[in-house]
């Protein structure tokens, strides 16, 4: 498991993550085969996993949009936090595919990122994450799971941290 940038308590107070405007949002986490298997092994109903290998959201009972199937809206907590998918662990950082290059971006809609973007902590974590994602194990993981490489074209508020060649 990778180190986290956001303290869990800070993240859970935001109420921005795990919610989606559309049922088929590009922001829905994609799942790797081993993550799907772990969910099934933990007796998660297969109906919560879409045919596109994404977590199937449900209509937000408190308003507009959709909620991650594993998000407890009453407690504002992830039910599977300790074994959440890779993309959930990575957020607010995103692996973005542009012009056949893999770009590590960060979502500036995250208030913690906005507040800490210029901090030493942010720079150190970005360096750690770049090194982590460029390790042979992670490069193989990305090559074996192309569904994790998304074209987040609608992200206007993202900072490109580093481009690493997908052919490594």
Where are the language model's segments positioned?
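Short loop/turn segments that flank or connect secondary-structure elements
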Residues: 1-168
